[in-house]
Amino acid sequence: MAEAQEKYQHQFQSQSPPFPTQEWVQFFPSPSPKSPAGTATTTTSSTKKDEKVKYMISTDPSLLSLSALDSAFTQEYMYWVKPLPAPVLKDMIDRSLCFGVYRCSHSNIANDNGNVGVEVDIDTDADPATARNMDATTNLTQIGFARLITDNVTFAYLTDVYILPEYQGTGLGSWLLQCVNAWVDGRGEYFRRFMMVTVGERAEGYYQRVMGVETQGRKGDVFIMGKKGKGAVV
C-alpha cells in the first residue's frame, strides 16, 4: 500500500500542466508613430501609412520575454502590479496559462517599439527551442500579454492583461480578449466559472461587450466579473 501511494505521489508531482499550445495570427493597422510620451519616433521604411502589420498570439511559454514583462510591470498603465524578482516572475509564468502578443517583423528591420517593447532574442531571452517554429528572418516583438490562473478543468481567473500604449486603438486588445474567450468557451463539461477583476465603469462595459462577462459584485470602482461554464451548478 505504501509503495503504491509513493508511486502515485511521484507520478502526480512529475506531471506538467496540460496546456496545449495554441496560436492565432491576424493583420492589424500599423501603430501610431508617436511614443507613449508623445515624442515623435521614426517610422521604418517597411511600415507605411495604412499598411497592415502581422501579429501573433501564442500560449507557448518559450516565446515569452521575461525582460519585456519586467519592463511592462514597472509602467503606470499596469497600476495593479509591482515588479517581481526574475525567479519569482519565471515561477509565475510556469504556473499560469499565458497569452503572449507579438508583432512579427523581419530581422533586418529596426525595432520601433518605444521604450518598453523588448524583442525576443532566441539566443538569450526566450527558450532556444522557439527556433523550431520561426523563420530565420523573422523577429517577434512582445507587445502585449494576458494570464490565466487555472486548473484547466473547472476554473480560470484572468489577470495581467495589457497592450503597450503605442499599439492601443488598433483592435489588438479586443483580439487578445477574444482569443482568451475562445480558450474559455472551449473548456469541457466540468468547467464551472471564469472570473476577473477590473476597475472603472468604462472597463466594465468593455469586458461585458467583448467577453460576455457579467458583473458579480462591486466595491467602489472595482468590479468583480465572470461568466458560467458548462459545468456550473450555481
Language-model regions, residue ranges each:
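Eukaryotic short linear interaction motifs
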Residues: N108-I109, P165-Y167, E204-G205
